[in-house]
Amino acid sequence: MATGKRLKKSREGIDRNKLYPIADAIRMVKERATSKFDETIEIAMNLGVDPRHADQMVRGVVTLPNGTGRTLRVGVFARGAKAEEAKAAGADVVGAEDLVETVQGGTIAFDRCIATPDMMPLVGRLGKVLGPRGMMPNPKIGTVTMDVAGAVKGAKGGSVEFRVEKAGIVQAGIGKASFSAEKLVENVKALADAVAKAKPAGAKGTYVQRIAVSSTMGPGVKVEPGTVLG
């Protein structure tokens, strides 16, 4: 079946003007995740912020109670004992000047980037490469740290970084279609709670305006915010 026809058929039974309780929304999304691969289940939260203003930026990291179902490749910029600590914790790529040169050469063999504080002057050279990908280490989300083992294990264990985009939207994967509905609901609530707690001082009016869930290839289902938050 062509992608367009599949998507049209998958929209059947979904009222685009209705807000569904999160449990029902997840069930509907799972039922429509019929691709041959294990689709990612995603959440999109429209927030009442304008990220062009520094006091309205929303970002953070949260460890989902049931993981993401995805194996992240973790890169660590560290030297000496901290480099060995990172390797022992399961980091996929560890280095210093050599790793900077590799990344500058166009090879990024990791999905999450962690650095010790002393490495940041060096890692700062990679801002134009890592920044647009949302991979630049940042102390606010725990990716610039001396606890490299904890950061690596957190990334491998299901931690998700979130950051509001230009349109005021936070999007994140919260599991796989193969997860039980209960586990997906728990993950949604954990991420939504973290986003709620990250409300910036400059936010005015209604903070969480709309929530929707979807699968990689499926339609979005609008969610009643009250069934997710609180």
Curated annotation (Swiss-Prot):
NCBIfam families: rplA_bact (TIGR01169). Belongs to the universal ribosomal protein uL1 family. This is Large ribosomal subunit protein uL1. InterPro entries: Ribosom_uL1_bac-type, Ribosomal_uL1, Ribosomal_uL1-like, Ribosomal_uL1/biogenesis, Ribosomal_uL1_3-a/b-sand, Ribosomal_uL1_CS. SUPFAM superfamilies: Ribosomal protein L1 (SSF56808). Binds directly to 23S rRNA. The L1 stalk is quite mobile in the ribosome, and is involved in E site tRNA release. Protein L1 is also a translational repressor protein, it controls the translation of the L11 operon by binding to its mRNA. Part of the 50S ribosomal subunit. Keywords: Repressor, Ribonucleoprotein, Ribosomal protein, RNA-binding, rRNA-binding, Translation regulation, tRNA-binding. It holds the Pfam family Ribosomal_L1. One of its GO terms (biological process) is translation. One of its GO terms (cellular component) is cytosolic large ribosomal subunit. GO terms for molecular function: rRNA binding; structural constituent of ribosome; tRNA binding. Disulfide bonds: none annotated.
